[in-house]
């Protein structure tokens, strides 16, 4: 019987992007043949600076993850706090008014919370 997983990964430090993206990749690889997954990544704090700090490889990995259906939400409060204009983000990244509110909303919908 196919199982449908719902996960929300929370990232708030720019230096943990590789870990979070690795976790997403490993999870999807582990369940690929048997189950379905809906994955959200919510970025707040310094994690949003990935778009400003010349981390092209991580940004490519984020874009690649969207091809498997992973959705990325960036916190507008964190963007403002880090002087990053929302318009500078690529189309495959969504913004939310507050990252913490999005996390709570997803948990209310049954998503499992993961903070690597």
Predicted regions, residues:
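Short, glycine-rich nucleotide/cofactor-binding loops
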Residues: 9-21, 50-51
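Histidine-anchored nucleotide/phosphate-binding helix
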Residues: 18-33
């Amino acid at each position: 019987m196919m199982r449908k997983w719902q996960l929300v990964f929370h990232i708030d430090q720019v230096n943990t992007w590789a870990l979070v993206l690795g976790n997403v990749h490993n999870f999807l690889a582990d369940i690929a043949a048997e189950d379905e997954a809906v994955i959200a990544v919510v970025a707040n704090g310094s994690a949003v600076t990935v778009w400003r700090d010349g981390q092209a490889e991580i940004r490519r990995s984020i874009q690649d993850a969207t091809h498997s259906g992973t959705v990325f939400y960036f916190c507008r409060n964190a963007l403002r706090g880090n002087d990053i204009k929302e318009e500078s983000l690529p189309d495959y990244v969504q913004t939310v008014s507050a990252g913490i509110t999005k996390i709570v909303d997803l948990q209310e919908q049954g998503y499992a919370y993961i903070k690597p």
